Amino acid sequence: MVSVSLSHHNLWPPESGSTAFRGFATAASVHACHHVSRHLRLDFHLRSSLKKLQHFSDDARMKFARYQRVFVFNGANFLKSRVDIRLSQSSPFVCFFNGGESRLNPRGGEEGSSNPETSKRNTVNGRRWTNVLLAINVIMYIAQIASDGKVLTWGAKINSLIERGQLWRLATASVLHANPMHLMINCYSLNSIGPTAESLGGPKRFLAVYLTSAVAKPILRVLGSAMSYWFNKAPSVGASGAIFGLVGSVAVFVIRHKQMVRGGNEDLMQIAQIIALNMAMGLMSRRIDNWGHIGGLLGGTAMTWLLGPQWKYEYTTRDGRRVFMDSAPIPLLLRWRNEQRRL
């Protein structure tokens, strides 16, 4: 995950003198992202392009049983499942989980046949917007190539121009990249963490976190303290701020559901190591925009804390279904508003 600061006089690849460091940064970033994809494993039967993600424990003593893999928010299935689920008629933020129709064998699998087409479709749906964002990054880079790499024209982050009213640069900078290696690192990182974040929060919350993090990245520099101007006056491009926001989003989810997740502390340690590694690389080179990384991380963390999900067990119905409530601040506020309307 690298966000590159560009010289005003050199808006294409960095000078050759930094080749050795760029090689180290590339290897370190790829290694860090590989650790993310290995350690953030979800038991939602969703796959990234690297491997099947399995994170939730198969331990029957967990508050979530093995078959409870679907979360519903306002009528939308955020995580796919093969079991029965019903949305509460009294509140759009209540989930009913029922595993009675899907028996589990001792090895952790389900008895009976499964539909390969359904499994494939669920896997694709679980990363649909990740694929869209990857395609946008590649298409925008092709457009840059066609225009001789003029990233300023396409919307690179330039503090002075943003302050003059070109606010669109807050968003467009996150889909631009300085060179092919920059694009490859960020696409690899997005492909590693994106499906996990999209599966945990669903497409709407995933996009909200990604876009907020992308915008929060330059805002921290433009509206922040004088130190941000001092350390990063140059234009910058890159999707790493938004990707850092997704990392923060996954961290918030793990923290909120630590009692339901086996190995949550280890996952948080891995996330902390990845963040620290990228921060260290930023300190070693002025061409890596640490302020963008910090801004994206804070933006994604804050948005996930507000939007959720934060699933809280409420009770078990007479027919054995467990009811979970999304108790994140905004879902709570919306539920309260809906209740007030019914009064």
Swiss-Prot record:
GO cellular component labels: chloroplast inner membrane; chloroplast membrane
Identify the tissues in which this protein is expressed.
Expressed in roots, cotyledons, leaves, seedlings, stems, flowers and immatures siliques.
Identify its protein family: Belongs to the peptidase S54 family.
PANTHER family according to UniProt: RHOMBOID PROTEASE, RHOMBOID-LIKE PROTEIN 10, CHLOROPLASTIC
Pfam family of the protein (one):
Rhomboid
Range of the transit peptide: 1-26
Location within or outside the cell = Plastid, Chloroplast membrane
The EC number of this protein is 3.4.21.-
Where in the sequence is the active site? S240 (nucleophile), H293 (charge relay system)
Matching SUPFAM superfamilies, A to Z? Rhomboid-like (SSF144091)
Q: Give a yes or no for keyword Transmembrane helix in this entry.
A: yes
Q: Name one GO biological process term.
A: galactolipid metabolic process
Transmembrane residues, as ranges?
A: 132-152, 167-185, 206-226, 235-255, 267-285, 291-311
Identify the keywords attached in UniProt to this record, alphabetized: Chloroplast, Hydrolase, Membrane, Plastid, Protease, Transit peptide, Transmembrane, Transmembrane helix
Briefly state the protein's biological role.
Rhomboid-type serine protease that catalyzes intramembrane proteolysis. Required for correct root growth, floral development, fertility and photoprotection. May be involved in TIC22 processing during its import and in AOS accumulation in the chloroplast membrane.
What upregulates it? Up-regulated by cold during seedling germination.
The UniProt GO MF terms for this protein read: serine-type endopeptidase activity
> What membrane topology is given?
Multi-pass membrane protein
Judging by the UniProt lineage, the source's domain of life is Eukaryota
The protein depicted here goes by the name RHOMBOID-like protein 10, chloroplastic
Q: Does the keyword Transmembrane apply?
A: yes
Q: What happens when the gene is disrupted?
A: Longer roots and increased number of lateral roots. No effect on the appearance of plants or time of flowering. Reduced fertility. Rbl10 and rbl11 double mutants have no visible phenotype.
Q: What class of enzyme is it?
A: hydrolase
